[in-house]
Amino acid sequence: MSVSVYLLDIEGTVCPISFVKETLFPYFSAKLPSLVKSDDVSIKSVLAQFPQHGDSQALQTHIQSLVSNDVKDPTLKQLQGTVWSQGYTSGEIKAPVYKDAIEFMKRKENVYIYSSGSVQAQKLLFGHVANPDNSGSNESSLDLNPLIKGYFDINTSGKKLESSSYEKIVTQIGVAAEQVLFISDNVKELEAAHAAGVKTLLAIRPGNPPVQENHGFRTVEKFDSL
C-alpha cells in the first residue's frame, strides 16, 4: 500500500535542531523572571498547575530546571507556547524552516505535524517562518499553516516514544498505518512508529547529533527526493 499521509517531526527534521535550544528556550528563559510574577489571568492559570506556584522564586527555579533538562511537561509546553506567541507576534522570533521542507509541504496534500511542543506552539512556528527567498523584504515571513492538514502533540496523542501514540494518530487521521510515513531525526521515535506499523524515514540534517550505527532505518538528507 502506497504512502498517502506524511507525518513530520519539527526540530532536526524540518528546521534546525538548534532553533529550539538556541532561540526558543533562551527567549523563554529571559522572560521567566517577569512571567512568574505576571498578573495576566491566562498566564496565572497555567502557573497554578505547577506545585510550586505559591512561591515565585521556587516556581522560577522549577520551571528553569524543566527547560534545562528538556522535560516534556505538558504544563511547561503550554506556558512556553504562550510566551513564544508573544515573540512570534512581535516579530522577535521567526522559524528557520528548511527551504526543501517548505517546497515539500507545498507539493504534498496530506501533511501532518507531530511534536512534543503543543499544537499552539506548532501553529505559531509554522505561521511565522523566515522566507528563505525574501529574508530582507517586507515579505520575510511565511504562513505555512494552510499547507498542514493537522497537528498532534503529547496532549492529543501521547508521548513520541510510545507506539500507542502513533496508533492513536493513525486512527485520528483515518487511514491504514502503512499509508503513513513518519519522518524524524530521533531513532527511538522511529522505532515506536515502526512498532505501530507506520512507515519511517530518518532525517539527517546539519547539526543533528550523530545516530547509532546499524539503526536499520532508511535516511533522507533533503526532502527534494520525496
Swiss-Prot record:
It comes from the Eukaryota. Its EC number is 3.1.3.77. Its main location: cytoplasm. Mg(2+) binds at D9, E11, D185. It is an enzyme of class 3 (hydrolase). InterPro entries: Enolase-ppase_E1 (IPR023943), ENOPH1_eukaryotes (IPR027511), HAD-like_sf (IPR036412), HAD_sf (IPR023214). One of its GO terms (molecular function) is acireductone synthase activity. Binds 1 Mg(2+) ion per subunit. Pathway: Amino-acid biosynthesis; L-methionine biosynthesis via salvage pathway; L-methionine from S-methyl-5-thio-alpha-D-ribose 1-phosphate: step 3/6; Amino-acid biosynthesis; L-methionine biosynthesis via salvage pathway; L-methionine from S-methyl-5-thio-alpha-D-ribose 1-phosphate: step 4/6. GO terms for cellular component: cytoplasm; nucleus. One of its GO terms (biological process) is L-methionine salvage from methylthioadenosine. Pfam families: Hydrolase. CDD domains: HAD_EP (cd01629). Its cofactor is Mg(2+). Keywords: Amino-acid biosynthesis, Cytoplasm, Hydrolase, Magnesium, Metal-binding, Methionine biosynthesis, Nucleus. It catalyses: 5-methylsulfanyl-2,3-dioxopentyl phosphate + H2O = 1,2-dihydroxy-5-(methylsulfanyl)pent-1-en-3-one + phosphate. Substrate binds at S115, S116, K160. It is found in: Cytoplasm; Nucleus. Monomer. Belongs to the HAD-like hydrolase superfamily. MasA/MtnC family. Bifunctional enzyme that catalyzes the enolization of 2,3-diketo-5-methylthiopentyl-1-phosphate (DK-MTP-1-P) into the intermediate 2-hydroxy-3-keto-5-methylthiopentenyl-1-phosphate (HK-MTPenyl-1-P), which is then dephosphorylated to form the acireductone 1,2-dihydroxy-3-keto-5-methylthiopentene (DHK-MTPene). This is Enolase-phosphatase E1. It comes from Zygosaccharomyces rouxii (strain ATCC 2623 / CBS 732 / NBRC 1130 / NCYC 568 / NRRL Y-229). The gene is UTR4.
